[in-house]
């Protein structure tokens, strides 16, 4: 059955600087910083958490429905999503804004300078979660990083519609205070964060992971640990789900989104959270072997038994 993917759609512009930032930036002159970097390589990727999650979930055989916002330059992205067979009926096109864009410069030491323009993501809350009367087939959902208002509103709307969802605050976690996090976690069925985000979330809500995992109505809390796998917390108990060795490590962009697609695929089918997380680990290891968040290809065998 369909899964509602609430999150961002963005263009990622990725460049590489063959030198070192440290050799170009003088610490004693940072108050008058004015630098320019020659970047011989440039690539533009389809990105955004909603797009990345939907891309992988569709390859798994899922039925993602994207709820997100594109700007006046998003026509090509919308057409691509549709060419992949993705349901874009809930995508908002905002003519007064550009599509969200992330611009990254990476130096020879893998240090990064990133600029992010939210664009249409800032008005993503204008798109609304369908009510049961409008669409009764939505079996599961996810609140992935998006505009702050969109994440808050869509969580409330999914909860009101009776759609069980994963709360995946990601890089937007600092945008919410402790009371807001407690409110959204209280509406969610599952929470997914990385280890750094887990520490920050616990600090914000004022409790540890065992206590947070006992939140009434919460069926599980997943903490990803990169190559080490992930921890699955349920009612105060934790299970370590081992990581999967990647064939090659090329680009971590979108690995977390691929993992979350695995969670959605398994949970929608009634799998245990541990089994769903194991699929997520396999997908993350596969994704890291390709560049960009939407260029990897899946073999049917990755789903397993």
Language model: regions and residue ranges:
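A broad detector of short, well-ordered amphipathic alpha-helices
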Residues: 52-55, 186, 196, 274-278, ...
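Gly/Ala-rich phosphate-binding loop of Rossmann-like dinucleotide-binding domains
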Residues: 58, 159, 268
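Ribokinase/PfkB-type carbohydrate-kinase core domain
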Residues: 1-20, 42, 63-65, 79-97, ...
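Alpha-helical transmembrane segments within multi-pass membrane transporters and channels
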Residues: 69-71
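Short, conserved aromatic-histidine micro-motifs
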Residues: 30-37, 75-76, 141, 278-291
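Glycine-rich phosphate/adenosyl-contacting loop at the front of the ribokinase-like
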Residues: 1-65, 76, 249
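Conserved phosphate-binding/catalytic region of the ribokinase-like
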Residues: 206-305
